[in-house]
Amino acid sequence: MKNFYGKVLPRLGVVLCVAAVVVFLVSSSSKAGSPVGEMTAGKVQLQSASALAFGPDGILFVADSMGGKVVALDTNDHTAMKMAAKINVPGVDTKVAALLGTTPDQIMINDLRVNPISKNAYLAVSRGKGPDAVPVIVKVDGMSGKLSEVSLDNVKSSSVSLVDAPASDTAARRNPRLQTVTDMEFTSGKLFVSGLSNEEWASALRSIPYPFNQADKGTNIQIWHASHGRFETAAPVNTFVPYTISGQSYILAAYTCTPLVKIPVSDLKPGTQIKPSTIADLGSGNTPIDMVPYKKDGHQYILIANTSLGVLKLKADNLETYRAIESPEVPNPQNKNISGVPYDTISDLTGVTQLSQVDDSNVAVLSKGADGMNLTTIALP
């Protein structure tokens, strides 16, 4: 036995030491290569919070249009939801206002996003009105509906400046700086950002690798707007979704008055100008708010919330077959689109101001009713 311990224990000690070193190195490598490993802790300064998006590991992207940057926050919200989230917060505007010590008429909910891991919802809120409004991020528990403010005093974060952000012009009909970022989506290791730039073709779409290093100039866009009967470069994309068409990656972008444009991701090169195809024109006097792509009963759909047209359910099975609209044709209002993607109107959904996908079957809906704003979860129609 003495010989056994004398020979085996030293060898066992060596094995354990080697194993410990391997575990340490793997752990260190994993941490260094993770998005959180690229962040530093401290106070985050925001001038505004205009749009939200989620990336890997529960990272929350916050667009600061007035600050001309995008901030990535470690929400530390990484625990997967084991049950289906059913967010239901009636009078959410009143509850947000109470949380922030003010009244509902003194807040604005700018965006809604659901964390795809935890299923908790996050709201980009302005406390106050005008240039003195204070940006706040509010978390809504996916199960209890409890609201809490996300502290920015000591949080891990990183940021990237948008080098081609437009200058502030308070005398303009609408300050272009406020539309530096209109929407964001994360996919395939990149954050796609729509909005305005300081270029002659002001409408821009930016593709920013994450973890952040730097942001190049965006790609500037000219579209054919059938409702207006002209080419346009000044209006930003209001909302968009990454989408695969015939095996190729596209951005499906919706603009005010309501052209739907497909933009090849391969065309997005810094500082260039592109002229993508308009494949639908859903009608003037309307602003699209949010888009949610999904699959149901073997078919592909895109849900679009709008200010005037209500919530539309676009049939997206064969987007590659729709010809480009290159003349002033407008689909008629009876769902018989003479040039564009067919759709149905979801009459049960009214007053919708924000949408965010919860999972493959459900969507979070922020809507305005007679008694204020309500946040609910419904099955995708």
Model-derived features with residue positions:
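Bacterial N-terminal signal peptides
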Residues: 13-24
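N-terminal secretory signal peptides that target proteins for export/translocation
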Residues: 1-10
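Sequence/structural signature of beta-propeller domains
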Residues: 30-381
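Cleavable N-terminal signal peptides
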Residues: 18-19, 29-31
